[in-house]
Amino acid sequence: MGQKVHPNGIRLGITKPWISTWYADKSDYANNLNSDWEVRKYLADKLQAASVSKIVIERPAKSIRVTIHTARPGVVIGKKGEDVEVLRAAVSKLAGTPAQINIAEIRKPELDAKLVADSIAQQLERRVMFRRAMKRAVQNAMRIGAQGIKVEVSGRLGGAEIARSEWYREGRVPLHTLRADIDYSTSESHTQYGVIGIKVWIFKGEVLDGMLPQIEEPKQQQPKRKPRGK
């Protein structure tokens, strides 16, 4: 069976960084991990309308630093920074340490797998045809500069009695190439017929930093065979 490994997990430490970067002793590790989970859950609930792609958590010197990657930084910051100050106080209370909130803007949301998946999910909830939503997402990504994109939707598509999966791909998406920069994410669309799952793979190019260029060896020409009888 053609089962696929998680594209982000297999590339951790190769082309993908971790989204939690801290070190802790055995006694503190479980508490920090639980604190990370609570902070992520709180921010995901609070910032549903802010097009948040990912949340990176660092813990320098008995404090917590949270970087929110979003396509709509104005929604996160609020008027004169009021909203971000509320978030900072809430994160500090959840983590039990001083907190710092940083905002990182995503300039090209069409090339972010999480934002593309969420966009398709919202369209399906508004009863847009799933094929049209998939095709629009693929065309936008390729127009902005993706080298390849694949979108898969699964569930009771179009209200069908039997659930099925359909996918659409353009360009190339090399899942086996570890140096390939592939952004992968999932989302769920809650429709009146049930839940529809969305998966998105976006291939942005190859990461070649620190790699030696491969020089092709010249092929040796085989001697020509003499015809028989001469």
From Swiss-Prot:
Keywords (A to Z) from UniProt: Ribonucleoprotein, Ribosomal protein, RNA-binding, rRNA-binding
GO CC terms, sorted: cytosolic small ribosomal subunit
SMART domains per record: KH (SM00322)
Cleavable signal peptide: none
Keyword Ribonucleoprotein: yes
BP-aspect Gene Ontology terms: translation
InterPro entries reported in the protein's UniProt record: KH_dom, KH_dom-like_a/b, KH_dom_type_2, KH_sf_prok-type, Ribosomal_S3_C_sf, Ribosomal_uS3_bac-typ, Ribosomal_uS3_C, Ribosomal_uS3_CS
PROSITE patterns cross-referenced by the UniProt entry: KH_TYPE_2, RIBOSOMAL_S3
KH type-2 domain ranges (all copies): 39-107
GO molecular function, one term: rRNA binding
Pfam family, one: KH_2
Record NCBIfam families: rpsC_bact (TIGR01009)
Family the UniProt entry places it in: Belongs to the universal ribosomal protein uS3 family.
Quaternary context: Part of the 30S ribosomal subunit. Forms a tight complex with proteins S10 and S14.
PANTHER family: 30S/40S RIBOSOMAL PROTEIN S3, SMALL RIBOSOMAL SUBUNIT PROTEIN US3C
Physiological role: Binds the lower part of the 30S subunit head. Binds mRNA in the 70S ribosome, positioning it for translation.
Protein's recorded name: Small ribosomal subunit protein uS3
Gene of this entry: rpsC
